[in-house]
């Protein structure tokens, strides 16, 4: 039985870079050991909090799909940067394993966007380790975009540690977003550059597939429509969430919990659902209680370790839903609402029920890219407003590189909050190494005043999503 399951896994994973096959088998052995959590049509991998699981509506995980095929000229597939074991993203520990296994020649290590700068020396092992340092340490891909021709700003200086210092075509470094739970997306890409006015999600994902194959995979010819359709169909089949917690156990309907990917699949959603800014077409008022999947755990009694872990998750859900936050200085939110101070909650920006992204497009600047938070491995862009002369510095102009608007500097979307435990580090630039770092960022940025207990509970909850 075990051999047959391993053989099936090999078949599923064979078109993914071979080190991931090895990692997948190792993880699957741990998965088999948890026989009580095996489900039909569910693929699970161990992560730092327990087990991440992906459910496919197709009834299988088709390794022959173009998503898993090399369609360009550099050996990459979509799966190169969207791994099941990493919640359909990619993480530094597994990237480092691939580097060590292949001496830095795995397809993810390509200079076009895997290196800190495309001109980096990759002639020796040490040179490759240096050239791909952001990818290895933070899982960052270089994104190069031209300053829009109609921009109302000028990039007057670039301080890039890797000599990619053009002021007309900027190099930015961002985490690959997970290619799962896409049914809930309202914005494609961190900066929304693959979301087009008047177009539906399928159109946007199709456009993204073409651009990714042309850019990341360096394809010589465009994808056929059949290939695009097949990739998008494949992506839309996946729903991912944490299925097992190391301390609390199963999260998927056992003992009153309603976690796991199948619940995500069944979650009702529509554009604007629960939007606090008036975008809900149903007219139903905003409800800050975004998550209810662990409600029944809040009344548990018992002093054993597992019960205490469940109670911590339930308390963390309550913290997420109910702790008030004084939201100030968030471009794209406070200024748009005309309110210098908005008394809100986590769900003010993460409002989609039991999913956690914003249910309408909402690019905002919460300060992650502020120059004050720069680390030595990040660039700094000095940008001047062509009309007012105002000058700002940022580590990533964000949405402004799409719209050409000075007011959009530093704006990004808020991602879906499912499957977090499997895909550290966090934020667009990987600046938060852990979920506790994420919580600390918000606590400091908005002067929330979390207690240590609240922080620990919130981390436990976020890790259970």
Where in this protein do the model-derived segments appear?
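Periplasmic c-type cytochrome electron-transfer domains
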Residues: 35-465
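N-terminal secretory signal peptides that target proteins for export/translocation
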Residues: 1-14
